[in-house]
Amino acid sequence: VGALPAISYDTDLGLGFGLIASVARFAPKFVPYRWRLELLLSANAKRAPGRGIEVPFHDDYLNMDFPGLAGDRLRITARVGFRKFANTGYYGFGNGSIAEEPWVGIDPETDLAAYQAARRYHRYDRIFPLLQFSARIRLWDRSTAEQRKRVEAFVGLHGDYNIIRPYPGSLLEQDIAAAKADTPEGETLADLLQGTDPHARLTVNGGAVFDTRDHEYTPTRGNFTELSVRAAPGVQLGLRYVGVTLSSAWYKALVGDWLSIAFRGVADVIAGDAPFYELARFGALTPRDGPGGGWSLRGVPRQRYAGKIKLIQNLELRSLFWRFSIGKSRFAVGAVAFLDAARIWADWRRTELGGVGIDGGSFKVGTGGGLRVRWGETFLVRFDAAYSPTERTSGFYVDVGHVF
């Protein structure tokens, strides 16, 4: 049993505050636990453009994890949640999309309203309650007490209801209007800019997982590979699409827990009429924002890049160098150095807007380092500072769990 203030920080979201609590029951022959519940009630506060404080992100959820069902062959996870993301990023599509700065030259002291509107040029408000369910079935298992060696299949459902609210004068508002024009540029935008009206969405997920990690939360040896498919039948607005993800993470101990190396490669592709916000996300088993943000390309703004084809790589050098106890609680402190890279394509064909290709440029890069604090066996907090030499932007992140 554990409960902590949910204190987090993200350059894009600001300071997070709230409560995170977890309850886990341990039992012999069940790794990592018999069951676990996690509750998060949180919001983020950030300095508003010009002056004042805004609350850009609100996140509540209850996670349920039952790994020991059907003779320890079935694992069921579920999440019920609600999110309000008032500064969701929208920069257009493709690897060559431009992050404009229309607020340059506007004095917030003399024209605060214009300055705040300009700072929201690449932002919109998204509100979505959600429900997730996933069942993982163990197909093959040769695990030992020291290390897993198993293959699992998973199936799941994800449902949400989305309300999209563009800010006046924002790029999203402009592109929604441009997508209605009977021009080549309008047709291109209309193909990519789907799902801007309120809508319900249902996706069916399925895939397989190969897991040889020595620890679920702080692995130093082994591999975790996901091959997954997510498909939406088009409940509303004709949002019918299929997404495929291949993600493989590798861990190698160099000097036990003292020094290890970790690498993840992700390829994510989408075909069909996906909602535009899905083009800035990847994965089915654990969906994440990216490329961009603290879970994919650190140092680059969240939702910075959007497209139907994504490649993401993460390399980390990890160390757990200090272990201690406070009462009956066990802690470990470590450090990480990392390098992230990503490349994206807007669509399967060459895509142009205004006669110019939007997929130019090379890989986007973020690099940095941070600290890790582990409490017990299932709770880890990370502190990461990052800089992107390709974007010339920086980020700082405090969150729960390794990036991969």
What residue spans do the PLM features occupy?
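Outer-membrane beta-barrel translocator domains and adjoining extracellular loop/strand segments
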Residues: 19, 50-52, 88-96, 165-174, ...
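Residue-level signature of outer-membrane beta-barrel architecture
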Residues: 7-9, 23-25, 66-68, 133-139, ...
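Short loop/turn motifs that connect adjacent beta-strands in outer-membrane beta-barrel proteins
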Residues: 1, 26-35, 68-76, 140-152, ...
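Residues that define the transmembrane beta-barrel architecture of outer-membrane proteins
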Residues: 13-17, 21, 33, 54-60, ...
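A subset of solvent-exposed loop/turn segments in beta-rich extracellular surface proteins, enriched
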Residues: 20-134, 139-184
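Outer-membrane beta-barrel "beta-signal"
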Residues: 371-373, 392-404
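Transmembrane beta-barrel strands of outer-membrane/channel proteins
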Residues: 7-9, 19, 35-45, 76-84, ...
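C-terminal outer-membrane beta-barrel translocator/porin domains of Gram-negative envelope proteins
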Residues: 47-49, 61, 180-197, 201-338, ...
